Amino acid sequence: MSEFSELVRILPLDQVAEIKRILSRGDPIPLQRLASLLTMVILTVNMSKKRKSSPIKLSTFTKYRRNVAKSLYYDMSSKTVFFEYHLKNTQDLQEGLEQAIAPYNFVVKVHKKPIDWQKQLSSVHERKAGHRSILSNNVGAEISKLAETKDSTWSFIERTMDLIEARTRQPTTRVAYRFLLQLTFMNCCRANDLKNADPSTFQIIADPHLGRILRAFVPETKTSIERFIYFFPCKGRCDPLLALDSYLLWVGPVPKTQTTDEETQYDYQLLQDTLLISYDRFIAKESKENIFKIPNGPKAHLGRHLMASYLGNNSLKSEATLYGNWSVERQEGVSKMADSRYMHTVKKSPPSYLFAFLSGYYKKSNQGEYVLAETLYNPLDYDKTLPITTNEKLICRRYGKNAKVIPKDALLYLYTYAQQKRKQLADPNEQNRLFSSESPAHPFLTPQSTGSSTPLTWTAPKTLSTGLMTPGEE
């Protein structure tokens, strides 16, 4: 159990009592534990003062605790606790702590982030001297360049996928990075939204343009607005369903991390917490893309920004927002205030034509309707003839412990789709039939664009780290 999970289970007055016990027993003072308790007590009071009592988030606790721990000092002779806290005015905080944790005194200084004078002067010097860096520090400008055209957008995704293939050593890391890249982009979502998806909620839903697709529910989001993550058929490499199948082969169920002081609503999450940090470091080090070289620029979270900009450039701006939740027209007959204040509790789904557009199987006609990009292939007809396996034992062997968490019907569909799709990608004749559009939505999905005429294939080692069966055993 993490320290945060332990602390949220301790009642506030019991936290105060533990602080008093620590201060009264003398040297050695466990400063790290004291810093954690003080931070939790302060955040509990601050959050409870809001009109709607807000939960204490793990990220908030970690940020404030770090500053407290670095500066914490206890003077036993005067019974005074010294530390820094991120507030403009700490007078009320000092008085509150002395009232709640009597008879001890508190001196709380304002924490200020140190300024790198040399860096600031150098930056101003370069600007005034007329030296412009080749790399733009404007994140928005770089994203606009990437999403300017269909080719520029999908070529960027292609290059990043190729980088992951070439620069990752461990298969587990490779499939996880590919999964993160594709799903945050294709769902216009924050990386944390993808991470917090509940795998036990996977379900098959019917889509008017594509047939059956999968979705998973996300109870926890940064905006506190629940949403879904969607997995739908797409042309070629960038396929959320294929990415999900590969990911579940290598990564078992991930226990849910407690991220707020409220009780967790579910037992498992989709991604490891450390994956986002690992991905950020990998991309910053290995990629030569300008967007990834901007200090503090988006990396794991780039997908939602890029997709929002891409949709905006294709007259679909209302379908996505930079906040990572799909947006729809406000409901008819509902006031603007009601829609913004409480109608978000009604679960909304993106329009089907959005999936059709992103799948690459459809294009927008001059009349504004979405029609098949090529008449030879209709994903609806293909879905109707897809031979869904009923072999649950095979599914249990293939997906291992994931089969105990994810509903069986979702895995049966996923397995069947993935196997058939890989056969198509491995068969040049079938691939040419499927991807012979004059203007494909995903220009990099032809064999020629990979720099080789070798058909795209996927193989797994004979023994997987999760003890699952290999594709050749089916």
From Swiss-Prot:
Q: Where does the Tyr recombinase Flp-type domain lie?
A: 135-421
Q: Which InterPro entries match?
A: DNA_brk_join_enz (IPR011010), Integrase-like_cat_sf (IPR013762), Recombinase_Flp_C (IPR005626), Recombinase_Flp_N (IPR022647)
Active-site residues, as the UniProt record annotates them: Y342 (o-(3'-phospho-dna)-tyrosine intermediate)
Supply the Pfam families for this chain.
Flp_C, Flp_N
Q: Which UniProt keywords apply?
A: DNA integration, DNA recombination, Plasmid
Q: Which domain of life is it from?
A: Eukaryota
Q: Which family does it belong to?
A: Belongs to the 'phage' integrase family.
Q: Ranges of Polar residues compositional bias?
A: 429-439, 446-468
- Function field: Catalyzes the recombination between the large inverted repetitions of the plasmid.
Q: Which GO terms describe its biological process?
A: DNA integration; DNA recombination
Which terms in the Gene Ontology molecular function aspect does this entry carry? DNA binding
Q: What is the source species? A: Zygosaccharomyces bailii
Q: Where is this region: Disordered?
A: 426-474
What name does UniProt use for this protein? Recombinase Flp protein
